[in-house]
Amino acid sequence: MGISQQAASQHLRELEDEGLITRNAEGKGISVMVTDKGRHELLRVYNILHDSLHSRPDHVEITGTLVSGMNEGAYYMSREGYTGQFQERLGYVPFPGTLNVDTDRKHGPEIARLDGMNGTIIDGFTDGKRSYGWVKCFAGTLNGTIPCHLIRLERTHHGSSTVELISKLDIRKETGLDDGGKITIRIPLEQED
């Protein structure tokens, strides 16, 4: 690689300190694993390079399958610390609950692209008993007709391939979709603040 062993060790230590990799001693060497945070950072850099070298699309399109969640979305979406911000920043208070969508693994770069975008931030807050994380919202449409926001959360129990949607509408009722239903989410890459 053209650098000394000490310089390589220092770089690895910095990456580990930032939570981008983990290192484990194995025999006479070490094993290096990229963390989820590191994978997201790699995808973010990939998207920047890709957009610099290729024509940039004007939207991200994500397909997936509707799945049941843990019924926590209704609780969180109805917290007073969030509802006022939703009304102020998105123009509506979401229908209680989130729509959970398992995306195909091939959409990892698109999801990482969203993670690297600004979106509309709903600030985290504390209610005296516990703290609640931030929510990053991206305006879009579901199946070409239903206005919604894809949300990325500071704290979530879902894996990286699951995204959540909110809307002022009861999406399940409006679409007649049940678990297992296929959906398409379209998110413009230029988001208005």
UniProtKB/Swiss-Prot annotation:
Protein residues bound to FMN: 156, 164
Stretch list, region Riboflavin kinase: 60-193
Sites where the protein binds CDP: 69-74, 169-172
SS bond partners: none
Binding site for Mg(2+): 98, 100
Keyword Flavoprotein: yes
Catalytic activities: riboflavin + CTP = CDP + FMN + H(+)
One Gene Ontology MF term: DNA-binding transcription factor activity
GO BP terms: FMN biosynthetic process; riboflavin biosynthetic process
Names of required cofactors: Mg(2+)
Key words of the record: Flavoprotein, FMN, Kinase, Magnesium, Metal-binding, Nucleotide-binding, Transferase
Region of interest called H-T-H motif-like, as start-end residue ranges on this chain: 1-59
Lineage: superkingdom: Archaea
Cofactor: how bound: Binds 1 Mg(2+) ion per subunit.
InterPro entries: ArsR-like_HTH, HTH_ArsR_DNA-bd_dom, RibK_CTP-dep, Riboflavin_kinase_archaeal, Riboflavin_kinase_CTP-dep, Riboflavin_kinase_dom_sf, WH-like_DNA-bd_sf, WH_DNA-bd_sf
Pathway: Cofactor biosynthesis; FMN biosynthesis; FMN from riboflavin (CTP route): step 1/1
Enzyme Commission code(s) on record: 2.7.1.161
Family note: Belongs to the archaeal riboflavin kinase family.
Known function: Catalyzes the CTP-dependent phosphorylation of riboflavin (vitamin B2) to form flavin mononucleotide (FMN).
PANTHER family: RIBOFLAVIN KINASE
Protein name per the record: Riboflavin kinase
Species, as recorded: Cenarchaeum symbiosum (strain A)
Lineage: Archaea, Nitrososphaerota, Candidatus Cenarchaeales, Candidatus Cenarchaeaceae, Candidatus Cenarchaeum
Gene: ribK
